[in-house]
Amino acid sequence: MARGPGPLGRPRPDTVAMPKRGKRLKFRAHDACSGRVTVADYADSDLAVVRSGRVKKAVANAVRQEVKSLCGLEASQVPAEEALSGAGEPYDIIDSSDEMDAQEENIHERTVSRKKKSKRHKEELDGAGGEEYPMDIWLLLASYIRPEDIVNFSLICKNAWTVTCTAAFWTRLYRRHYTLDASLPLRLRPESMEKLHCLRACVIRSLYHMYEPFAARISKNPAIPESTPSTLKNSKCLLFWCRKIVGNRQEPMWEFNFKFKKQSPRLKSKCTGGLQPPVQYEDVHTNPDQDCCLLQVTTLNFIFIPIVMGMIFTLFTINVSTDMRHHRVRLVFQDSPVHGGRKLRSEQGVQVILDPVHSVRLFDWWHPQYPFSLRA
């Protein structure tokens, strides 16, 4: 028998008060235990008001108990879906929760399966070693490599790099580009190339005499460089000498030569290790002038130069001379290298000023005008 309203028309104390518009509905555990059901627990509730669009299991169980208590049915007789189904479609609260759990499990399984396949594919790629061809094949292919492509060829694999270390490779390269009309120094002639000592360095030097693409590179060497060379910074001065040049001019010119050893690229990158040629080919790769270069400055007058051998070259500038007709070269030497872009004071170090300057040239160790020992 239904109970009527309380005295004076006031609502019953157990009546559920509806929340104000715009406030979020929060689920509390004691509300579920007491069998309290709100609009937010249904599937067609406003998602802007409800924090999550998914019905929690605790809420679904509370709804089931509420339906059972209202209908007076046992749990084993009537399913909750039938009790909740009215004139319209059923609100599949429990099914929606189970379906979402199943979907999440399927997504998780697919993600794990995809990761396993990706890992298995990566292991298969790592395990695939490929074909390893014998050294004779690479030596045969090296006979068709241009001199400017030797570096790219050596980077193909370790066997290709090993081939470029052999004496046979450099000897064949020399014979392939040698011509009878080539004007070569005594050390670079065929009768001297039978020596294995410094064979690689001598072949590279000879290519700048015989190979046209290499010779064209050094032919475009202006008397005064367009920009001040920056590769000599922190180089060590190994040797210094000057000589008198008698030419068409009434007064002779003077040539000042500074031999530098550049800072090793391994020291710049702080890399002490690296590929070393095989022991049996160390004599072939020996080069006393490795990382060396020659700075040659020609002046119109003789200029006294202080002793700078053994010092570190830290500053190099080329400016216009005071007469606006020639150039002025300033060299600064220090006892130790300068790192971190630290600027030097004008009074620090040993300064060498050459003025007026006729020409400034920089020669690497493979340049034809670089002086090298005949014993190399």
From Swiss-Prot:
Its organism's taxonomic lineage begins at: Eukaryota, Metazoa, Chordata, Craniata, Vertebrata
* Subcellular location(s) of the protein: Membrane
Q: Where are the transmembrane segments?
A: 300-320
Q: Which PANTHER family match?
A: TRANSMEMBRANE PROTEIN 183A-RELATED
A GO cellular component annotation here is: membrane
What are the annotated disulfide bridges? none
**What protein family is recorded?**
Belongs to the TMEM183 family.
Q: How does it sit in the membrane?
A: Single-pass membrane protein
Let me know which tissues express this protein, per UniProt: Expressed in brain, lung, pancreas, thymus, intestine and blood. Not detected in heart, placenta, liver, muscle, kidney, spleen, prostate, testis, ovary and colon.
Q: What is this protein called?
A: Putative transmembrane protein 183BP
Protein's organism: Homo sapiens (Human)
Region Disordered: start-end pairs: 1-20, 102-127
Swiss-Prot/TrEMBL keywords = Membrane, Transmembrane, Transmembrane helix
Gene from which the chain derives: TMEM183BP
State any further remark: This gene was derived from TMEM183A through retroposition after the divergence of human and chimpanzee.
Keyword Membrane appears in the UniProt entry: yes
Which residues does UniProt call coiled coil?
none
